[in-house]
């Protein structure tokens, strides 16, 4: 890797990290328009329950709807961000996140949550944007059961 490409890589990583920070800030300000602005116009977003939203307008609308009640008092935190540049214009990002302050659909306070997101980012005209977003809740990892082996 040349000094130039190493420097460019550091610049790109910093720019991508700014996207992740901006996404967190937009969520915590309950600003769906700002949240959606970090996505490409034709982005795909799959939320923690598997709902698939297509395109920036739908992402903005669904995030706005979710913040009317369930997430209006939520605080979302990027606990760990791992960035991997695949090419000069494509990156994959894994975000370990946590959330407090949300409500369950029945109105009861939600328990603190943790999860992992996978983002595919694409550089468009000098700006990094999320082209694909997949979110999942996580549970503590446990050992796989060994069980009895079957012969035969």
Model-derived segments and spans:
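A beta-strand edge to alpha-helix "cap/lid" segment located at domain peripheries
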Residues: 2-37, 44-152
